[in-house]
Regions:
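Secondary-structure boundary elements
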Residues: 130-189
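Solvent-exposed loop/turn segments at secondary-structure junctions
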Residues: 167-172, 176, 195-197, 221-225, ...
Length: 362
């Protein structure tokens, strides 16, 4: 007896509020993308065990095949389960027929734009990119070359990428309840100038790789909401970096803070949660921005020294972080500038709690 088999699996791990609409949007988007080279894989040998099947499926996904046709002996739908490959990177559908215990199945794959972009770098082939993705990819290559020509240390390259993203783009769109799928993509962030956390993290990820950095994306939650950020390896030790959280809302392209730049597990876990078994442990503090530059104030005297040192160098923007020391109001800072000849002082930061502050004077 022949049975018709039809299964569809859509990845469900897109990072924003109201994810259902974003997933539906992706489903519609991948069916209309133009300008991509399509490929099909046909396995001439029958599959006799699940490990052989998994290897073939992984090969198809890694090569971004559009279809994979197979014959499976002793087929059991519960064993040959495509949910095994659940990922935000790929949507998989399966159609075919089962006669007795032999199944003839064609799997179809649709790939997230971010996956195609990252794989283009990893494989060195841009054949799978559509026209818009190709233009953005080349723009990122140019940016990475610019950064590498200016900086030699991994820390400086990382900071340059962080600062580029924070000062160039903004979080959004903020005028819709559910951000469109495009707002989750590298392409959307670069070409539209705005995006959500996934776009920020994936852009940091691919630029980091292009600059030779050991960087990866990490998924979890921030204050209970699905979120994506990054982990970077510097001098053999790992750090968290959340570029999205360092970009102020509403956007201020002139403001740079580093509250989430190279944090330990303990530091970032104040607001973030994740499956710690799936990612490297982050315990180092050397390359935390404020530690690295000596911009940590634990009392009034240390804050005074930080400000005076910056002013002596002619700096008009001063950043620092308080630890075990609370600034209750802007007056706590303004008093340090009295008699120094400035007509305006612009301060950003959360008074009444420890954290990062930025001061601009003129």
């Amino acid at each position: 007896m022949k049975k018709i088999l039809s299964i569809f699996l859509l990845c469900q791990n897109v990072f924003a509020d109201n994810l259902g609409d974003a997933i539906t949007a992706w489903k519609n988007l991948v069916s209309t993308v133009k300008g991509i080279t399509y490929s099909a894989i046909n396995s001439s040998l029958p599959i006799k065990d699940v490990e052989q099947w998994k290897a073939l499926m992984n090969e198809a996904i890694n090569n971004q095949a559009d279809t994979l046709s197979v014959t499976i002996v002793n087929f059991d739908q519960n064993v040959y389960d495509i949910t095994t490959f659940r990922s935000y990177d790929v949507a998989i559908s399966a159609k075919g027929s089962v006669t007795g215990t032999i199944a003839n199945i064609t799997y179809s794959f649709s790939y997230h734009s971010n996956y195609r972009m990252t794989r283009a770098y990893e494989t060195g082939s841009k054949d799978k990119l559509n026209v818009e993705e190709l233009a953005v990819y080349d723009k990122l290559v140019t940016k990475a070359q610019e950064i590498k020509s200016q900086y030699t240390s991994d820390f400086d390259k990382e900071k340059a990428i962080h600062d580029y993203i924070v000062t160039t783009f903004k979080y959004g769109p903020l005028d819709v309840e559910t951000p469109p799928l495009r707002a989750h993509t590298i392409v959307g962030l670069i070409n539209d100038g705005e995006g959500v956390c996934e776009a920020y993290a994936q852009t940091f990820n691919i630029l980091g790789k292009m600059c030779g950095l050991d960087v990866q994306c990490i998924t979890g939650k921030m204050e209970g909401v699905s979120h994506m950020w990054n982990i970077i390896k510097l001098d053999g030790e790992y750090y968290h970096v959340d570029v999205t959280s360092d970009d102020p809302t509403p956007d201020d392209g002139n403001r740079l803070i580093y509250s989430n730049f190279n944090l330990t597990d303990e530091q970032i876990s104040e607001k973030h949660t994740w499956d710690t078994s799936q990612f490297p442990k982050c315990t180092a503090t050397k390359y935390n921005y404020y530690d690295y530059y000596g911009l940590v104030a634990t009392n009034y005297s240390e804050l005074q020294n930080i400000i005076n040192s910056a002013l002596s160098k002619g700096q008009k923007t001063i950043t620092f972080e308080t630890r075990n020391y609370i600034l209750n109001s802007s007056n706590d800072i303004k008093s340090l500038f009295q008699g120094k000849g400035f007509s305006s002082i612009y301060i950003t930061g959360d008074f009444g709690e420890v954290g990062a502050f930025s001061i601009t004077v003129s």
